[in-house]
Amino acid sequence: MPFVRPLVTVVRAGRHSYSAGLQLQQRLARSNQILNPPAEFRNYLVLQEHDPVYTVGLRTKDYTAQDEDRLRRLGADFHRTDRGGLITFHGPGQLVAYPILHLGQFVPSIRWYVATLERMVVEACHQMGISSAKATKDTGIWVGDNKICAIGIHGSRYVTTHGIGLNCCTDLQWFEHIVPCGIEGKGVTSLSKELDRHFPVEEASGALLNSFAKVFECRLQEHAKKPASSAEIG
């Protein structure tokens, strides 16, 4: 029987609050999780930008109410999430991609998924002219000692949520108020900084989609329209 590449629907969600993006991905994951067999699952790749927000993952216990208040006073929101990883920033100029996949259609392994996600981002960076981008023992994708892409995922019953935040033309000053992903002595960078030109999210999206289809060996289809809310998808 010939191999049929899994189908993934691309949802271009635009810019909105972190809460709205979280509700969208949770709804998509919940609506499909009950399906059996996994072949019936509808896979999604949600592309978006967030309003300024600091998020902390499952392992973060260090950020107190005072820390949260300090960060909110900068003009950003603050959320505790169910993803892996420590604190990071999302905001305008950053391409956030949330793959909502049933790994039963790919490889049923969270370890494989994280490694493939890393490979996908590295491939996309190479396509955009950053040949030195690579994965290391530290989470995320790096250019030298500077992180260009954060990775934090959640998996339940082989259904993935959360994903990546690729700095395109992000204002990197937001990162100066935290220790990104809890890694001391390292910095952050962006496509714009590395390539010495303005690199918008829309331009990066094309390379990311090309890389995603190639590395995950899947077919991509565009969702019919940009959703105004999670209720418009299903």
Swiss-Prot record:
Gene Ontology molecular function terms on file: lipoyl(octanoyl) transferase activity
Active site: 181 (acyl-thioester intermediate)
Subcellular locations according to the entry: Mitochondrion
InterPro entries referenced in this protein's UniProt entry, alphabetically: aa-tRNA-synth_II/BPL/LPL, BPL_LPL_catalytic, Octanoyltransferase, Octanoyltransferase_CS
Record keyword Transferase present: yes
Enzyme class: transferase
Catalytic activity: octanoyl-[ACP] + L-lysyl-[protein] = N(6)-octanoyl-L-lysyl-[protein] + holo-[ACP] + H(+)
Site description Lowers pKa of active site Cys, residues in chain: 147
Transit peptide, residue positions per record: 1-28
Key words, A-Z: Acyltransferase, Mitochondrion, Transferase, Transit peptide
GO cellular component entries: mitochondrion
Pathway: Protein modification; protein lipoylation via endogenous pathway; protein N(6)-(lipoyl)lysine from octanoyl-[acyl-carrier-protein]: step 1/2
Listed EC numbers: 2.3.1.181
Matches recorded under HAMAP family: LipB
Protein name: Putative lipoyltransferase 2, mitochondrial
Organism: Drosophila melanogaster (Fruit fly)
